[in-house]
Amino acid sequence: VDSLKRVADSLTAKVNEAKTKGLTALQVPKKEEKKASRPEDPVEEGTDLVVRNLLTGEEKKYKLVTDYLFSKKGNTLVIETSKKNGDTLSKANVIWVSTASGKVDTIFRKFNDAKSFSLDEEGTQLAFVAERDSVAKALRKFYKLYYYSIGQDSAKLRVDRSTAGIANGLTVNDFANIQFSKDGSKMFFQVAPIRPIKDTNLVDFETARLDIWHYNDDYLQPQQLRQVDQELRRGFMAVLEKGSDKVIQLGDEDVENVTLVNEGNADYVLANTTKGARVAAQWQGFALQSSYIVSTSDGNKKPVAKNVRGFFSASPSGKYVVWYDWQKKQYFTYNVESGAISNVSKNIRTSIWDEDDDHPDDPPPHGTMGWQENDKYVFIYDKYDIWKCDPDGKEMPVAITNGRKNNLTYRYWQLDRDQRFVKEDQPLLFTIFDNKSKGNGIAYVRLNKPMQQTYVYPAAQIGFVKAENANVLLYNLQTPSSHNVAVIPFEENLSGNISNAVVLSDINPQQKDYNWFTVDLMKWKMFDGKMAEGLIYKPENFDSTKKYPVIFYFYEKDVDTRYFYRAPAPSASTINIPYFTSNGYIVMDPNIYYKDGQPGESAYNSVVSAAKYLSKFKWIDSTKMAIQGQSWGGYQVAYLVTRTNIFAAAGAGAPVANMTSAYGGIRWGSGLNRQFQYERSQSRLGGTLWEKPELYLKNSPLFRADKVQTPLLIMHNDADGAVPWYQGIELFTALRRLGKKAWLVQYNGEDHNLVERRNRKDLSIRLSQFFDYHLKGAKPAPWIVSGVPATMKGIDWGTTVEPEGKKAF
């Protein structure tokens, strides 16, 4: 009986176990078998890398390559290879190839991932980060820094979380680049916080999804979300000196932006931060900077300057830190050895800031040309000239050009991208811009010799490249009707004279078969009595006995582009000038001259005065004038149709219609708040909405929508990351409510300007049809007459115009 009871109890226990664990618990246990090894996770295999000697034609092929890096001198090639799926003997490797001998050494094996390869200047040292210990799907992986030098048998571990100098909670940052100093004595890398990982046991539908905006956040939530990937990869610079086993941390949460000085050879780095000043960027558009020098030997920080509106940089040899203070409108230097701060521009007799800037804000500087060898001088621009300045502020500044006298602007064109300074006897290339004619030229200059005669031509000369072993410049030569590649000698007495240039190309030869355009500089007196400038484009076959329709296109100031080539192309947002002139239009592009607090009236003063002036010419049909603009130009178009009825049609792309609602909005492309734009930037209102509400109302087209008589075509796309899409909707719905003639073209998924060519072609057709109908009396397209209902979306675009006398099936 007892034995039967024990059997019954055993069966009962098995049944209960089966209820909880499943029926497998009732199965007869199998004999232990040797566990089969788990197959390795498949990897993304590398591809073939072919290295060819261009002189001999000899080739070498490397298989399964996932990454590679040549040294600067080409003497070393580092290759990372993957394992081959299905081949248990295949492993990932890092290979060192000496290109001269062809010798191949495997210097690193048995790892899951390796990246951020960096070679020193001589191609004899290598650093990289690698991860060896985690499974493929691990949520957290710890990378380590490895180092190899010629002569070692393999790469050695140099830095991990336990290395001296690595603070608790930090690890090697696997997302950052690694750099050697120029002399190879230091290795710069990054450490990063060990971030918490997501709890995979949490179920999405049981957890809240939200963003919390806090008034003390450095950045608004939309900006944080736009930058979240960048922030998750953020690290802090650190350095390991050759022969040392201790890491020196150079950056941290307080000074996060660190740059090398003298290519890393200096005994300090430059660290800048905006910490403590970021909230104000919401309405200022900038954050004040503080700058420090940080020792690479012990991490000690010394302040250079605090809470300055400006950007700091080190001189090439590292003797000075230089910055422009926007509020003081001066350049300052910090002498690293003495700690002295000098105002190096105080004795420059002219404005080194943009005196033509018309924003209610501190004007920006014209910038610097760079430094002379050994940090002897720093060169500072004014509007016209270049000033040689003593970085200690003891010598008087000297202008090395004479542009102001002749209304010419000189700027240095750096021919050698790797050159960090200029030498006194070095041939330099200066570009020249004629502020009167808008022509361009170049000059051959030596700092230790007087300036030569300069030449200016009705052309644009850009993109200069010097031949490495010859005194010849290759460049882009543009005129309004041609765009070609040319060469010119880079020698004394020859470079500036364009007659010495040889044109090498004949780009767009088919252009001769089309009606092109001419462009002239036009000047007129505005309503406020001041003189204005603009560009007027006429058809190549212009006939002064005929009358032409006119489209005014504008943004801010474009006259300096007088001699630039303009290519016919589908429109991203604005009218294509070659297309419209070729089709019998005159296009006028007037400069806009702004006054603080009056952006709308400034546009009226500039554009309408230009229209009145142009109307005096017999070849202008003053009843057939239109305006078109995009973004800021779109706003000005929207404002102008509330102020005047002289235009027969208008096109406004991405216009701000209501400055009161747009003021607190977000630029969704960047996550930035829009307040700074209205207070200090493009809108130029000069105050907050609550300080100057009357300016926001006066300059908002929406509040004068009842005055509009001009047919208005609006384009505003539903993925606009710059101007909120609802601004176009506010304007359109107001005009629709008032019974005005208005159209809103909205491209799905498109940003501020159109990207997809199919949409650009479509907009080009609609712009042409819209203006042809209103200015030339052409038959209107169906979309103009009756729109396109949602039921016909993707079936009928409404752009097909049937010829007169024919009916569609």
PLM region descriptions:
Residues 1-475, 481, 493, 781, ...:
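Beta-propeller folds
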Residues 347-359, 498, 505-624, 628-630:
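Cap/lid segment of the alpha/beta-hydrolase catalytic domain
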Residues 566-809:
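Active-site-proximal cap/loop segments of hydrolase catalytic domains
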Residues 274, 433, 478, 553-557, ...:
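Glycine-rich His-Gly loop
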Residues 478-480, 485-488:
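Blade-level signature of beta-propeller repeat domains, shared across WD40, Kelch, NHL, RCC1
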Residues 135, 150-152, 294-300, 317-319, ...:
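Secondary-structure transition/capping motifs at alpha-helix termini
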Residues 51, 96, 238, 248, ...:
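Hydrophobic/aromatic beta-strand patches that form the interior of the parallel beta-sheet core
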Residues 336-352, 393-407, 447-449, 491-499, ...:
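Active/binding-pocket-proximal capping segment
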